């Protein structure tokens, strides 16, 4: 029978538990406390850098998604220019939305033409027609008579002119016809993802190399990306395109996007003295159309 007044030897907080295994401290006569567990290894500088890098990528993605789309995005603070490496990721999301709409339309029996029209409309809605607006403004400004100051003034005008309206009609027709020609949902989805990723992936390159047409406005507020950001954007866009379509088709599509970018950039330098937010929108739209036209012949 156990004595109720005797301390429980299994109680690690009692006196008996203290002196059961540990020898007494000669200075105090009390049992020395048991050594606790060894502390675990602390994360080294490489692990911390990895965590910080992942956090920076997440921040850049949310920043670009919130800027380029109307989708609910986590509000974050940061520089849009330095987040430029995530431009293709936001484009990929837009392409996924368009591809999903096309797939659903195709599954319920819509024709390829009508499903393509709905897919293009969905991408315009999800982006708030941000780039389409830039294309229309640039075409209106290029169609006006006058010098650089006059053209820049027209770029600020939010009203849609004849040239801008025609540009939107032709751009929509080209995109819809290209998607309808691909027909198969898997081809259309891949083409949309590649086109939207690549057409946004070239924008940091323009922003890092061209002069601003004016010191204020959306483009000026975004800042100038570093060359490293521009190259990262191109690499990520190409990787996304390779996964979405095929390596050869993705490479040709990137070259088509770069060619369209170079042509619009040269024109903008002569006509506006540099680039603006509207010019970037026009570059995205022309690059997107060039990519889709090339993909029709390749996939």
Where do the protein language model's features map onto the residues?
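Glycine/small-residue-rich loop that forms an oxyanion/phosphate-binding "nest" at active or ligand-binding sites
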Residues: 133-136, 140-144, 152-153
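Hydrophobic alpha-helical transmembrane segments
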Residues: 1-128, 149-152, 157-299
């Amino acid at each position: 029978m156990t004595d109720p007044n005797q301390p429980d030897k299994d109680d690690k907080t009692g006196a008996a538990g203290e002196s059961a295994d540990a020898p007494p401290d000669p200075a105090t006569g009390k049992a020395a406390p048991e050594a606790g567990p060894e502390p675990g290894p602390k994360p080294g500088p490489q692990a911390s850098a990895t965590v910080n890098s992942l956090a920076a990528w997440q921040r850049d993605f949310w920043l670009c998604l919130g800027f380029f789309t109307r989708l609910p995005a986590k509000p974050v603070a940061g520089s849009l220019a330095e987040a430029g490496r995530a431009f293709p990721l936001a484009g990929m999301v837009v392409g996924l939305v368009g591809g999903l709409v096309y797939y659903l339309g195709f599954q319920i029996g819509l024709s390829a033409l009508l499903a393509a029209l709905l897919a293009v409309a969905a991408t315009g809605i999800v982006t708030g027609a941000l780039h389409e607006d830039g294309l229309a403004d640039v075409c209106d400004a290029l169609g006006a008579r006058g010098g650089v100051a006059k053209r820049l003034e027209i770029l600020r005008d939010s009203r849609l002119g004849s040239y801008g309206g025609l540009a939107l009609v032709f751009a929509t027709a080209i995109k819809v016809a290209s998607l309808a020609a691909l027909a198969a949902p898997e081809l259309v989805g891949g083409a949309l993802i590649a086109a939207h990723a690549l057409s946004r992936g070239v924008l940091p390159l323009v922003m890092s190399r061209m002069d601003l047409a004016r010191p204020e406005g959306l483009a000026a507020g975004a800042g100038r990306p570093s060359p490293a950001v521009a190259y990262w954007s191109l690499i990520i866009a190409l990787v996304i395109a390779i996964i979405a379509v095929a390596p050869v088709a993705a490479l040709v599509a990137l070259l088509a996007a770069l060619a369209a970018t170079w042509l619009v950039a040269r024109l903008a330098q002569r006509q506006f003295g540099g680039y603006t937010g509207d010019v970037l929108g026009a570059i995205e739209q022309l690059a997107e159309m060039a990519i889709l036209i090339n993909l029709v012949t390749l996939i």
